[in-house]
Amino acid sequence: MVMKVPIRTRLLWGTDIDDVQYPTREDFIQFCQAQKGSTASLQDLRRDHIEQALGISYQELKCWFEEYYTTPMFRALRPYDDAQRIMQLLLERGEGIVTTARPDHLRHKTYEALERDFGSRVFARVYFTNDHDNNPGAQTKMELCQELGVTLFLEDNLRIALECAGAGIEVFLMDQPWNQTDQELPGNIHRVKSLTHAYESMNGRH
């Protein structure tokens, strides 16, 4: 059971896009099955290295993702069923920002999708950190959240969650096969099954 965390008055909250707002990895795996003959499933992604589950190199993975980004599947990707409702509820509590490690060339498609699915008011700002390839010059999500004063963050990547938690940010970690760990999580990381679960664990819901 997740500890209830008080929602601060007029908080600045942040969220990742992929696998938090949209089931991107699940959709990508379906693309790999249909177009690449892969037999991997979402449950095979036990670590945050998709290429290992697919049995390909990291460079091949990047090429597969680039191909996926051009498909009707990616253009048709829609948010999780509860995403729009929960984001509207969080908007009543404060301002929301998006941080994503998506490549720069997806900016336009990303803005279009967020506008289409959430409207213009939910996410006041969208930041592309460009740290997907461990670019040494890129700003990390933790650094960005610290700079902006984000106090609550929704994420699916365990490493990023730990970094943010270490900086004193409250993190709601979406429970996924790739972020499982035997280590005990810090008290300000809360593993949740869905966005609804995350919101319901925040005190002050009513």
Could you describe each region identified by the protein language model?
Residues 74-75, 83-114, 126-129:
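Substrate-recognition element of Asp-dependent hydrolases with the DxDx(T/V) motif
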Residues 2-63:
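Active-site neighborhood of HAD-like aspartate-dependent phosphohydrolases
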Residues 150-193:
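Acidic, Mg2+-coordinating phosphoryl-transfer loop and its flanking beta/alpha structural elements
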Residues 101-102, 119-137:
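A short, structured active-site edge motif that brings together acidic residues
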Residues 50-85:
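Metal-dependent phosphoesterase signature
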Residues 11, 124, 151:
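Conserved acidic residues
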Residues 22-25, 30, 105-109, 161-163, ...:
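Short catalytic/ligand-binding loop motif for oxyanion handling, primarily in non-cytosolic enzymes
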